[in-house]
Structures are given as structure tokens and as C-alpha cells.
């Protein structure tokens, strides 16, 4: 067991019965020329987030945590995105951007596209799990819940983009399914103004989970920390 200093209070977890979740670290969300950038969102400050996720993944893997990578998107025909009868059709900024700029059709969040790919710096390793997801929450229409329960995993540590959309949505759904969710705030990035990040973190630490940071997380997983607890 290890103790992670967090807000609003410390939380105890067993790394080998926990998972690090990397949410949607795709070119779409973290790279100039990707969907978020083309839709008018600022992605200029995502590089430190990528580096922090690399650090967190390395520490988590060394501690025996399961690493789960999400990729958000749909088939090339966008059948999985839903048609006019789906609220996703009307609210997805990727779909709206493509309707405004038809030349982008088939390029944004389409499986197999550059936009859909994980950023070059983040490469899943053997033993990691990569899951596609068609909506903001990683629990919707995916085997995530089954994967976690079959391994006895109850604690989830979240990183990725966007804090206020897919990260928060997945953590909230996990809360409703009795999972303990922690966000590493400096390994996440919002879609929108800075206040969106602050609001999401406030919601999480006040109502749905815990908030920590990468350095604290890595320190908690270090052998010396385990020795102190033992």
C-alpha cells in the first residue's frame, strides 16, 4: 500500500490493484494542426503536459500499475459518432468543425488518421491496454469496467486531455461505479480558458475524487515511500 498526498485529503491505494488512465493524448488534442487547434482551442501549452505524462507512466509501470490509453474518435464514415438523432452530432466540436469546413471531412478523429493517433512522445508498451472510445466518458460503450473489475482494480489515476471534458466525464462515471478517482493536475490540460481547468479540478476534489500532481505521485511510488509505510 502507498499513501498519496492529495486534495482534499491523502488517499491510500495499492499500486498493483490500481490503473493509470491516459485520456486521449492524440494529435487531435495536443498538437498544432489537430482537431482542437483547428476548432479554435489553444493547444500551445500542451508540451509540459506530455512530458509529465511520460514521467507518470514510467513511475506507474515500474510500480506494477496497469496503464490504459484511451483514443477518442470514430470510424471513417462517422457512423459511431451518431447522426442528427444523437446529441453528440450537435455538440461535438469536431463534427461541427467538419460541417463548417467540409474539406476536413474524414480527417478529424477518424480512426487511422494522423489526428486520431497518439502523440509521438507517448508510446504504449507490451502489457498496456489501448481502448477506443466513441464518447467523452471512457466507460461508455467500452469494456473498461469489465477490464478493471476482472483485475480487482478500484483506484484510477487520471492524466490527459481535456480535464473538463473527457477526463472529468470518465472520472465521474467511475465515481458512480464505485471507483476511487485521482487526477494529476499537471498531467492534464483543459479545452478552453484556464478557468475551465480550475472549475474541473474544483468539481473533482469537492465532489467526485482527489487531486494530486506528478511529483507527489512519483514520490509516493518510490521504494523509499513503500519502506516508510511498511
UniProtKB/Swiss-Prot annotation:
EC number in record: 3.5.1.110
Reactions catalysed, as given in the entry: (Z)-3-ureidoacrylate + H2O + H(+) = (Z)-3-aminoacrylate + NH4(+) + CO2; (Z)-3-ureidoacrylate + H2O = (Z)-3-aminoacrylate + carbamate + H(+); (Z)-2-methylureidoacrylate + H2O + H(+) = (Z)-2-methylaminoacrylate + NH4(+) + CO2
The keyword Hydrolase is assigned to this record: yes
Biological process, per Gene Ontology: nitrogen utilization; uracil catabolic process
Induction or repression: Up-regulated by the nitrogen regulatory protein C (NtrC also called GlnG) and repressed by RutR.
Keyword annotations: Hydrolase
Gene Ontology molecular function: hydrolase activity, acting on carbon-nitrogen (but not peptide) bonds, in linear amides
Active site, per annotation: 24 (proton acceptor), 133, 166 (nucleophile)
Domain of life: Bacteria
Gene3D superfamilies with a match to the protein in the record: Isochorismatase-like
Reported function: Hydrolyzes ureidoacrylate to form aminoacrylate and carbamate. The carbamate hydrolyzes spontaneously, thereby releasing one of the nitrogen atoms of the pyrimidine ring as ammonia and one of its carbon atoms as CO2.
Family the entry assigns: Belongs to the isochorismatase family. RutB subfamily.
Protein name as it appears in the record: Ureidoacrylate amidohydrolase RutB
Gene of this entry: rutB
Amino acid at each position: 500500500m502507498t499513501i498519496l498526498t492529495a486534495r482534499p485529503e491523502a488517499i491510500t491505494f495499492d499500486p498493483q490493484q490500481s490503473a493509470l488512465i491516459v485520456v486521449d493524448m492524440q494529435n487531435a488534442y495536443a498538437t498544432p494542426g489537430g482537431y482542437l487547434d483547428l476548432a479554435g482551442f489553444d493547444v500551445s501549452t500542451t508540451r509540459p503536459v506530455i512530458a509529465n505524462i511520460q514521467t507518470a507512466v514510467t513511475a506507474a509501470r515500474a510500480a506494477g500499475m496497469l496503464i490504459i490509453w484511451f483514443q477518442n474518435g470514430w470510424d471513417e464514415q462517422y457512423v459511431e459518432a451518431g447522426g442528427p438523432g444523437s446529441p453528440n452530432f450537435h455538440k461535438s466540436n469536431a463534427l461541427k468543425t467538419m460541417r463548417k469546413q467540409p474539406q476536413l471531412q474524414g480527417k478529424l478523429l477518424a480512426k487511422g488518421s494522423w489526428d486520431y493517433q497518439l502523440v509521438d512522445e507517448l508510446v504504449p508498451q507490451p502489457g498496456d491496454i489501448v481502448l477506443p472510445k466513441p464518447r467523452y466518458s471512457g466507460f461508455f460503450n467500452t469494456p473498461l469496467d469489465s477490464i478493471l473489475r476482472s483485475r480487482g482494480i478500484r483506484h484510477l489515476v487520471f492524466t490527459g486531455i481535456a480535464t473538463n471534458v473527457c477526463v472529468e466525464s470518465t472520472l465521474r462515471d467511475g465515481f458512480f461505479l464505485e471507483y476511487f478517482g485521482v487526477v494529476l493536475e499537471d498531467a492534464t490540460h483543459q479545452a478552453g480558458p484556464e478557468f475551465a481547468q480550475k472549475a474541473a479540478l474544483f468539481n473533482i476534489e469537492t465532489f467526485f475524487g482527489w487531486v494530486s500532481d506528478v511529483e507527489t505521485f512519483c514520490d509516493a511510488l518510490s521504494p523509499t515511500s513503500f519502506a516508510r509505510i511498511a
